[in-house]
Swiss-Prot record:
InterPro entries: Ribosomal_bL33 (IPR001705), Ribosomal_bL33_CS (IPR018264), Ribosomal_bL33_sf (IPR038584), Ribosomal_zn-bd (IPR011332). Keywords: Chloroplast, Plastid, Ribonucleoprotein, Ribosomal protein. It comes from Chara vulgaris (Common stonewort). PANTHER family: 50S RIBOSOMAL PROTEIN L33, CHLOROPLASTIC (PTHR43168), LARGE RIBOSOMAL SUBUNIT PROTEIN BL33C (PTHR43168:SF2). This is Large ribosomal subunit protein bL33c.
Amino acid sequence: MAKSKDTRITIILECNICSNNKKSNFPKSSRYTTQKNRRNTPNRLILKKFCSNCQQHTIYNEIKK
């Protein structure tokens, strides 16, 4: 039987630079969706990914849904 509380959850990663820059030409910041294991990484996930708005590799932070 499957457990009611899954260990893998879907999270949203948002660009740190785009979310802080309110005066940018792009109305929304760049976002990625991915999964993480709740048991192995209980803290918020931080990854370095490519941002299409900034045109460079930036830090992406996990955000609340």
